Amino acid sequence: MDSSRTIGLYFDSAHSSSNLLAFPIVLQDTGDGKKQIAPQYRIQRLDLWTDSKEDSVFITTYGFIFQVGNEEATVGIIDDKPKRELLSAAMLCLGSVPNTGDLIELARACLTMMVTCKKSATNTERMVFSVVQAPQVLQSCRVVANKYSSVNAVKHVKAPEKIPGSGTLEYKVNFVSLTVVPKKDVYKIPAAVLKISGSSLYNLALNVTINVEVDPRSPLVKSLSKSDSGYYANLFLHIGLMTTVDRKGKKVTFDKLEKKIRSLDLSVGLSDVLGPSVLVKARGARTKLLAPFFSSSGTACYPIANASPQVAKILWSQTACLRSVKIIIQAGTQRAVAVTADHEVTSTKLEKGHTLAKYNPFKK
């Protein structure tokens, strides 16, 4: 590839699907002269993306990990309320339930869960959440049904370095994010598909820029880029493959590639499905090479933590909205990427109002 062009995707920044709003911090009295952050919920509806009679509610919880008691003490007073030390904020995705009940009651049920946690390790540092008790309305959630969830600590804990390897740890839910989405729309691309490469292939990448509302004095700005209009983050996502040759064995021109990409009629949005995520919707026809990257209804979900854990954790607490989206065509192998120019394609949609709402519980 000896040239570089861009396919910029159109989006409506005013639409709710282009924004992710943060929870506002609201303090309430505890009755003993102290204050605590009031539990909150938020609801985002993405059921307009696809015509569907069956919607699911994806539940993402945000809360705090506490150490209960002091395991090193050998003498002490027996107390009904042992000391609880705040260690770090954390996120736990519970899974989904059918959208058949009261969403506010569903959020309230999450607050009553009893969850413990501990560290573990495989090839990465893990955090294992154990569900001790959960209301009946949550029993169909994958994590509740399995009684546990083992997750990458860096992606799910704000400050994993603060979590000890022993002692009694408790995860307390404080914020509940509910996303209503057509049942078949949430499709997480298999890792094996994302690793496919070949010299006869082109990789399609999505370069997503997200505006982040943040106080200039916040330490979070150290992880963000700055423009005249504020701060933003960059993400790079692998969204598909295309062949370099046609059925006759002739090399496919960039003009033909751009035409195929535009015919996909792509839309992009922000949501909180598997944590803060970029959602992609292809309304046009998909080739056999592109099929594994989308659900049967043409959707794909990209958890931001997989691309950039740091950016994902910033979005736990800050309002964000889509700034720009570009499709970039790259060579099909990493070696070829290193020695060839990228090709950018301009055009497609950013879904209106995909915003991550004002949460802000987790200032580190």
Curated annotation (Swiss-Prot):
<keyword id="KW-1188">Viral release from host cell</keyword>
<dbReference type="InterPro" id="IPR000982">
    <property type="entry name" value="Matrix_Paramyxo_N"/>
</dbReference>
<comment type="similarity">
    <text>Belongs to the morbillivirus/respirovirus/rubulavirus M protein family.</text>
</comment>
<keyword id="KW-0946">Virion</keyword>
<keyword id="KW-0261">Viral envelope protein</keyword>
<dbReference type="Pfam" id="PF23765">
    <property type="entry name" value="Matrix_Paramyxo_C"/>
</dbReference>
<dbReference type="InterPro" id="IPR055413">
    <property type="entry name" value="Matrix_Paramyxo_C"/>
</dbReference>
<dbReference type="GO" id="GO:0039660">
    <property type="term" value="F:structural constituent of virion"/>
</dbReference>
<dbReference type="InterPro" id="IPR042539">
    <property type="entry name" value="Matrix_C"/>
</dbReference>
<keyword id="KW-0468">Viral matrix protein</keyword>
<dbReference type="GO" id="GO:0019031">
    <property type="term" value="C:viral envelope"/>
</dbReference>
<dbReference type="GO" id="GO:0039702">
    <property type="term" value="P:viral budding via host ESCRT complex"/>
</dbReference>
<feature type="short sequence motif" description="FPIV motif">
    <location>
        <begin position="23"/>
        <end position="26"/>
    </location>
</feature>
<keyword id="KW-1198">Viral budding</keyword>
<comment type="function">
    <text>The M protein has a crucial role in virus assembly and interacts with the RNP complex as well as with the viral membrane.</text>
</comment>
<keyword id="KW-1187">Viral budding via the host ESCRT complexes</keyword>
<dbReference type="Pfam" id="PF00661">
    <property type="entry name" value="Matrix_Paramyxo_N"/>
</dbReference>
<keyword id="KW-0945">Host-virus interaction</keyword>
<dbReference type="InterPro" id="IPR042540">
    <property type="entry name" value="Matrix_N"/>
</dbReference>
<protein>
    <recommendedName>
        <fullName>Matrix protein</fullName>
    </recommendedName>
</protein>
